[in-house]
Amino acid sequence: MKFAVALYHGEFEKSAFEKTQKWISALDTNLEYFEIQKTTVTELLENLIAGAENQNAESVIYTWSDCPFLDLELTKELCHQHEKYGAEYTFADGYPYGITPEIIHLGTLKILLQLSKQNPELGEGKVSRTSIFDLIKKDINSFEIETLISDKDFRLSRLEFASGTKFGKILCERFEKLIEAEEKKLGKTLCATEKCELAEKSPEILQ
């Protein structure tokens, strides 16, 4: 299956986007990506479809571009599950926002586009971080959904790693320093769960 990466841009710091680009290159040096900056959900879907078709991609790996901690191994596992089980929508559950992307099949995007037009309260609304899943929930039993479940549920901690706001940028900078210090101390690279556990027990991240 051919994948393309779609990055949704807000008015974000360039440094966050650079880290996201490194994540894409680490996934696959030949993986193409396209950028979107639209205001409504319907426009977002139209551009996701056009971008996928322009690259002859069957599915889109979708994320906002201000997520500097997207996990490489979890993304690869999501792609594997999406392809293996012929999923229409694949996501990870239990991890903080900003650790994993969403994967949407091209055919699903076309169905969601029609749903967005049938539900103007969503379709004409401004793009949010949950826009895709909000539409899927309108007819959730009609989709083949695959879920990668975290070994530990971090949702109660309300962690979110996105640097698109002033507070988010400060939080991500603190988290990056924590990870670097912990990896230096342990002499190894932390996996996604270990990073999240580190954040969960750090007052400077939870405040």
Which residue stretches match the model-derived regions?
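Conserved nucleotide-sugar donor-binding
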Residues: 99-114, 166-171
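Basic phosphate/pyrophosphate-binding loop/patch that engages nucleotide-derived ligands
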Residues: 78-88, 108-127, 138
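A conserved hydrophobic position in a structured secondary element of the catalytic/binding core
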Residues: 65, 70, 104, 163-164
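Conserved alpha/beta core of the MobA/IspD/sugar-nucleotide pyrophosphorylase nucleotidyltransferase superfamily
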Residues: 129-207
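Short beta-strand-to-loop acidic/aromatic patch adjacent to the donor-nucleotide binding site
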Residues: 56-68
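Conserved donor-nucleotide/metal-binding helix-loop-beta segment in metal-dependent transferases, i.e.
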Residues: 69-97
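N-terminal glycine-rich phosphate-binding loop and ensuing alpha1 helix
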Residues: 1-37
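Active-site nucleotide-sugar/metal-binding loop of Leloir-type enzymes
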Residues: 45-59
